């Protein structure tokens, strides 16, 4: 059974005025029309759900686990939650990340989420010749990103789009090489309606591709 995991990294989880949320909802409507009844869709809202960060409790728990020591109740609780997040991620084969671009990078809760899924011997392993991703089984990743600026003009902004560079590099590292980003960009300088319409078209095409169906234009 195929499973799609939606990773909502917007601080305002259901903000109807958010461009990234609008584009995501348009994608989801299109996607649901195309997938079979056997497809499962799950969603994690990073700013509503508990997503542990790497802090002294987590570091202490990891050290104790490595030494075979007993965890405190707090350490056990946080590591169990981290394991739940990891297993949910591993159980999917298609991923959709929704985020606003803040100061050229991903939201902080998305970084915390990445720290929950980038676990040695689970999603990658160390070898004598370097690290190897363990998710090389045809998984697919779609990133929906909204931004006030434009990041595809091959200029200074392109160089500092750290969100895209980081996510693409990390998921490639884990073995997920089918990576696509849809940008609803330029909301601060372009006509918002035009930005949305362009992004809607792109996510419709992305939904079709991810559902293994293709839209053919009669005007070709």
UniProtKB/Swiss-Prot annotation:
The keyword Cell inner membrane does not apply. InterPro entries: Flavodoxin_fold (IPR003680), Flavoprotein-like_sf (IPR029039), FMN-dep_NADH:Q_OxRdtase_AzoR1 (IPR050104), NADH:quinone_OxRdtase_FMN_depd (IPR023048). It comes from the Bacteria. Its cofactor is FMN. It is an enzyme of class 1 (oxidoreductase). Keywords: Flavoprotein, FMN, NAD, Oxidoreductase. SUPFAM superfamilies: Flavoproteins. Binds 1 FMN per subunit. Transmembrane segments: none annotated. GO terms for molecular function: electron transfer activity; FMN binding; oxidoreductase activity, acting on NAD(P)H as acceptor; oxidoreductase activity, acting on NAD(P)H, quinone or similar compound as acceptor. FMN binds at residues 18-20. It catalyses: 2 a quinone + NADH + H(+) = 2 a 1,4-benzosemiquinone + NAD(+); N,N-dimethyl-1,4-phenylenediamine + anthranilate + 2 NAD(+) = 2-(4-dimethylaminophenyl)diazenylbenzoate + 2 NADH + 2 H(+). The keyword Manganese does not apply. Its EC number is 1.6.5.-, 1.7.1.17. HAMAP family: Azoreductase_type1 (MF_01216). Homodimer. Belongs to the azoreductase type 1 family. Quinone reductase that provides resistance to thiol-specific stress caused by electrophilic quinones. This is FMN-dependent NADH:quinone oxidoreductase 1. It comes from Bacillus anthracis.
């Amino acid at each position: 059974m195929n499973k799609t995991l939606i990773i909502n990294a917007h601080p305002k989880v259901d903000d109807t005025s958010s461009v990234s949320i609008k584009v995501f909802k348009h994608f989801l409507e299109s996607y649901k029309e195309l997938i079979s009844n056997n497809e499962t869709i799950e969603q994690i809202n990073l700013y509503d759900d508990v997503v542990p960060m790497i802090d002294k409790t987590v570091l202490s728990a990891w050290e104790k686990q490595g030494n075979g020591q007993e965890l405190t109740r707090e350490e056990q609780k946080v590591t169990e939650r981290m394991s739940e997040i990891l297993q949910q991620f591993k159980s999917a084969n298609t991923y959709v990340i929704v985020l606003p671009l803040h100061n050229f990078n991903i939201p902080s809760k998305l970084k915390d989420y990445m720290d929950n899924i980038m676990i040695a011997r689970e999603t990658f392993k160390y070898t004598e010749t370097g690290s190897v991703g363990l998710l090389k089984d045809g998984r697919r990743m779609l990133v929906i990103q909204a931004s006030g600026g434009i990041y595809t003009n091959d200029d200074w902004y392109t160089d500092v789009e750290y969100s895209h560079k980081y996510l693409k590099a990390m998921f490639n590292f884990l073995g997920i090489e089918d990576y696509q980003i849809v940008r609803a960009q330029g909301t601060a300088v372009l006509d918002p309606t035009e930005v949305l319409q362009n992004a809607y078209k792109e996510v419709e095409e992305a939904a079709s591709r991810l559902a293994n169906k293709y839209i053919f234009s009669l005007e070709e």
